Amino acid sequence: VRGGSGDAVTDIRYVSHKIYDGKPSLPGLPATFAQEGQAQTLEVEAVDAVTGEKATLLYTVFEDYPVITRSVRLENGGEAPVVLERAYSSCVELPTMDLDMVHLWGKWWNENNTERRALQHGITSIQSKRGMTGSNHNPFVAFARPSTTEESGEVWGMNFIYSGNFAIDTEVDT
């Protein structure tokens, strides 16, 4: 977030949270849906006390599926105009570095080719700056133990339902 004075310093801190049944809709965006009894949502509110910028994080768990969905609402609660330059969707720390990264890539009429490779030390990035989802790089990644197959094993998967530009960055350190 870049403020009216040109600064890019934001100090958003936790204010409150609530848990409720169901899943809120995301007007104008593709999304998953759930009724009361099918899911529960954790809503976390954080605010920058100086600028009034507000972030509301929504995490929904589904009763019948091993899925957590996440969305964020950003609001300018201050009086000065701001420009949102970038908003990352999540940061996930996995329990091991001994994982393969699975990514889907392609081209027109040859979409969703699977690429699987071991995570390496350093940073790996899969991204698209086309402003829309396309066949070159699918906004999906999975992290699987090397012994995992299509039928068994542990996998952590993430997918943007609505992406535009996206970056999936991984970093392996010691």
Where are these predicted regions, by residue range?
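Polysaccharide-binding surfaces and accessory modules of carbohydrate-active proteins
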Residues: V1-T174
